[in-house]
């Protein structure tokens, strides 16, 4: 893969990580509000876990691309 392609993919991966951080923070606020108000939190907890799992994948991809770029 050439440098330009890796740089484009890395920029996209960075955007995914940033967006994931925002989604996780928002979902945590939703969960806190549900808990505070005495509502069922099962679905909110499941959704938070989905976001956390996705974020792990985004971070892995970003780190892989950083390593690829450093190896050029």
State what each model feature region is:
Residues 1-72:
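Anionic, Ser/Thr-rich low-complexity intrinsically disordered regions
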């Amino acid at each position: 893969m050439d440098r330009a392609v890796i740089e484009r993919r890395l920029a996209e991966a960075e955007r995914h990580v940033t967006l994931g951080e925002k989604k996780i923070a928002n979902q945590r606020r939703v969960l806190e509000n549900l808990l505070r108000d005495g509502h069922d939190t099962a679905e909110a907890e499941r959704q938070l876990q989905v976001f956390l799992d996705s974020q792990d994948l985004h971070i892995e991809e970003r780190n892989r691309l950083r390593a690829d770029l450093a190896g050029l």
